[in-house]
A protein has these predicted regions:
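Beta-strand elements of repeat-based all-beta scaffolds
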Residues: 1-17, 21-38, 42-59, 63-80, ...
Length: 277
């Protein structure tokens, strides 16, 4: 059994494993994670500024990362263990418009008047453009490479209800989607013409998934709409719930069961594996 112990704030402070080892979490008074100590003795450490922004992180290998912020709490630089610094620049609306890595390579971002991403230019000069319809749905992304190359376009088609009905990739292959009157996905047809269909019960939950090769997955729910059984070509997986609505156990098609225990605040306190492992 693996047991989890929590502090007064509901945060995990110790995980105890069946072999007697443990992972220990330490927090600051405000609840921010201060350190983690793993079973092998290695640990991670975290530091924060007065506003709660992460300013320092030390990895299990002893590598140190430092983070700096502007007056609006936006991250403006990251220093890696080797001393290299990455920088971030923002526009007046708080959107990243330029990211520069420790080698000086820059990626630039442009936006539409509506705030959607319009263009990305990477350090090699490759540009990706994004187009949208009047509703703000992405309709096309176009990636340009070396001069003279054809742009690589991905096209998205939408219905009037706002559902994606087709995606056409740069090779011209199309994946299509259909929906029922309730807006639920009814079928997906991949580029090779293979169809996966979804079938719903009266309460709107998926009851069966049918694949092009004839295989099916059946799903059964209890009276309060919780999934309790999945039947597929491998067999039946059963899910038992406790009175509070938490998963109490999962039994796979081979009869192996994993059990879960929960605390009064809804936190998971233990996992019981088959054969006690």
């Amino acid at each position: 059994t693996t047991s989890v112990f929590y502090n007064e704030l509901g945060k995990a402070e110790r995980i105890c494993y069946p072999n007697g080892s443990s992972t220990v979490y330490e927090y600051e008074k405000g609840g921010r994670l201060k350190s983690v100590r793993y079973p092998d003795g290695a640990g991670e450490h975290y530091g924060y500024d007065a506003k709660g922004n992460l300013t320092e992180r030390t990895t299990t290998a002893g590598e140190n990362y430092r983070y700096n912020y502007d007056s609006l709490d936006r991250m403006i630089s990251v220093q890696n263990p080797a001393g290299g610094i990455s920088y971030f620049t923002y526009d007046a609306l708080g959107r990243v418009i330029k990211a520069e890595n420790e080698s000086g390579n820059q990626t630039c971002y442009e936006y539409t008047p509506n705030g959607n991403l319009a263009k990305v230019t990477d350090a090699m000069g490759n540009e990706t453009f994004y187009q949208y319809d009047a509703m703000g749905h992405l309709t096309q992304s176009s990636c340009t490479g070396a001069e003279g190359e054809e742009p690589q376009n991905t096209v998205y088609t939408w219905d009037k209800e706002g559902h994606v009905t087709a995606v056409t990739d740069p090779l011209g292959d199309v994946e299509c989607y259909t929906y029922d009157p309730a807006g639920r996905m009814k079928a997906k047809i991949d580029k090779d013409g293979y169809e996966t269909s979804f079938h719903y019960g009266k309460d709107g939950q998926v009851e069966e998934i049918r694949y092009a090769d004839g295989r099916t997955v059946s799903l059964t729910y209890n009276a309060i709409r919780q999934l309790e059984e999945v039947r597929d070509w491998l067999g039946t997986t059963k899910i038992a719930m406790d009175e509070a609505g938490h998963i109490a156990s999962v039994t796979d098609p081979y009869g192996k069961t994993v059990g879960y225990e929960w605390g009064s605040m809804g936190e998971r306190t233990a996992i019981c594996y088959p054969h006690g492992r």
